[in-house]
């Protein structure tokens, strides 16, 4: 779990919409989904501000949402997730109501890189030495069982090593 690409692969490989749908149904699966700890529209800049993003100065005008600044930093870091969508919420912008993390292709890339880096450290991950994760859940609950199965299926489908 210390490998950043391994952690990203798991985060990008989990179809949170399918996972939540097991409890609230397809119609509401995105209703409670947030893509960052703090909502992107939590605060706006009161005045023009210049921010250093990986060595590049970027000026944001007054009224810029916090989420836009966070998204710009994430993009500059090369992390392929969306925590702020300026077109969401009928054009008002939001970090909520969509799954900005799930992307099986990106998960596959991240896990491939993780496996390569871990191999360089002497750790073999292959069909004979697979990654195994234990998920604790109340098997007496159909909802929890379905959620665990959803988690398992989405991770296995989106990572090259299952």
Segments the model singles out, each with a brief description of its role:
Residues 2-158:
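Append "and occasionally in soluble cytosolic enzymes with long acidic Gly/Pro-rich linkers
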């Amino acid at each position: 779990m210390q490998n950043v690409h391994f952690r990203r692969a798991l985060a990008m490989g989990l179809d949170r919409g399918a996972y939540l749908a097991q409890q609230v149904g397809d119609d509401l699966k995105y209703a409670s989904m947030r893509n960052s700890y703090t909502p992107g529209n939590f605060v706006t800049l009161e005045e023009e501000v210049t921010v250093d993003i990986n060595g590049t100065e970027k000026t944001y005008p007054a009224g810029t949402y916090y989420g836009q600044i966070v998204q710009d930093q994430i993009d500059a870091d090369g992390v392929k997730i969306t925590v702020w969508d300026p077109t969401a919420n009928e054009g008002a912008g939001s970090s909520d109501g969509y799954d900005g993390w799930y992307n099986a292709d990106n998960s596959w890339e991240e896990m491939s890189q993780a496996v390569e880096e871990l191999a360089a450290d002497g750790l073999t991950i292959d069909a004979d030495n697979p990654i195994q994760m234990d998920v604790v859940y109340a098997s007496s609950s159909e909802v929890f069982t379905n959620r665990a199965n959803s988690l398992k299926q989405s991770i296995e489908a989106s990572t090259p090593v299952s």
